[in-house]
Amino acid sequence: MTQDELKQLVGQAAADYVNANVPEGSVIGVGTGSTANCFIDALAAGKTRYRGAVSSSLATTARLQSHGFKVLDLNEIDSLPVYVDGADEIDHSGAMIKGGGGALTREKIVASVSDVFVCIADASKLVETLGSFPLPIEVVPMARTSIGRRVTALGGVPVVRVTKEGVPFITDNGNEIIDVKGLRISDPRTLETHVNAWPGVVTVGLFASRGADLCLLGTDTGVDTIRFSKG
């Protein structure tokens, strides 16, 4: 299968999971990116089962609304039974690198309040050790250089994310992103806590303290379900 076909496969599998496990009238948390878009497209047929969705980005909001979903403010929600999102990398503990699409902060906020985090990905995203994919850090613009120096001290190579026009990429929150290359992340939870404590960091794209509960992994032979122990 092509990567696009695998994304469609896991998008449908996630919609099937949500329809089977989430009560009618619930609100669904939805991530950002091409794989999350496949989930939105697949869930659209059953959208009347749900009160609405909480979106992790302006792009996801537009996609949801194009299918007729009501998009709700997270501040209006008492509970969020499930959050579905893709990953740039995921390891065998359920820790992830996310933020390739630039929505890491809102993704982390929505994931943090969800009861179940369902990661949807193709098999190429499952890795033994995180770090081959550059690690995004959302930063307040005035702290970009100082955070870059801290990244270098860790052994990473900081690269300011730019648009195709060559200007800094700006997140939905008005911040910039540093992509860190060259890290081998053997202890993602500790690194997440460490980087998040740097002045000027909004959040780092490590999802380890609140990782995935299960992963629907697309392979050439179908969808594998991986459940992660949080004990």
Swiss-Prot record:
Gene that produces this protein: rpiA
UniProt EC number: 5.3.1.6
Active site per the UniProt annotation? E107 (proton acceptor)
What protein am I looking at? Ribose-5-phosphate isomerase A
> According to its UniProt record, what is one Pfam family this protein matches?
Rib_5-P_isom_A
Q: Name one GO molecular function term.
A: ribose-5-phosphate isomerase activity
What does the function comment of this entry state? Catalyzes the reversible conversion of ribose-5-phosphate to ribulose 5-phosphate.
Question: Where is substrate annotated to bind?
Answer: T32, G33, S34, T35, D85, G86, A87, D88, K98, G99, G100, G101, K125
User: Per the similarity annotation, which family is this?
Assistant: Belongs to the ribose 5-phosphate isomerase family.
Q: Which PANTHER family match?
A: RIBOSE-5-PHOSPHATE ISOMERASE
Has UniProt tagged this entry with the keyword Transmembrane helix?
no
Q: In which pathway does it act?
A: Carbohydrate degradation; pentose phosphate pathway; D-ribose 5-phosphate from D-ribulose 5-phosphate (non-oxidative stage): step 1/1
Q: Name one GO cellular component term.
A: cytosol
Keywords, A to Z? Answer: Isomerase
Q: Per its UniProt record, what CDD domains does this chain match?
A: RPI_A (cd01398)
HAMAP family per UniProt: Rib_5P_isom_A
Q: Name one GO biological process term.
A: pentose-phosphate shunt, non-oxidative branch
Reactions catalysed: aldehydo-D-ribose 5-phosphate = D-ribulose 5-phosphate
Top-level taxonomy: Bacteria, Pseudomonadati, Pseudomonadota, Betaproteobacteria, Burkholderiales
Record's subunit section = Homodimer.
